[in-house]
Amino acid sequence: MALQIDGERHLMRLTLGALAELEAGLEEGSLVELVRRFEEGRCSTRDVLALIVAGLRGGGWDGTAKDLLSAEIAGGPMAAARAAAELLARAFMLPEES
């Protein structure tokens, strides 16, 4: 999936390394608790930012969360929240059986 930041399209994916980095940086709990917060609609902007950074890093981006604080994300904060939720859902989706 992709997100447009400051007019530039960036690919995002949650690789195993990106997930490990995300979990290590979480201030509140584990990935399971992060998933639960999203499912229950209790995610914070900090959760959204952490997921977007992890997805971008998994897609090859070299930036940091600080780089995104003043960035313009196409679609605004709601688009960022939707992208974060979709990243999380895709990361834990079971592969389709062939």
Language-model features, listed with the residues they occupy:
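Charged interaction scaffolds used for protein-protein
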Residues: 1-9, 24, 29-46, 57-98
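A short, sequence-level motif marking secondary-structure junctions
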Residues: 14-19
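A residue-level signal for conserved active-site and pocket-lining positions in enzyme catalytic cores
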Residues: 52
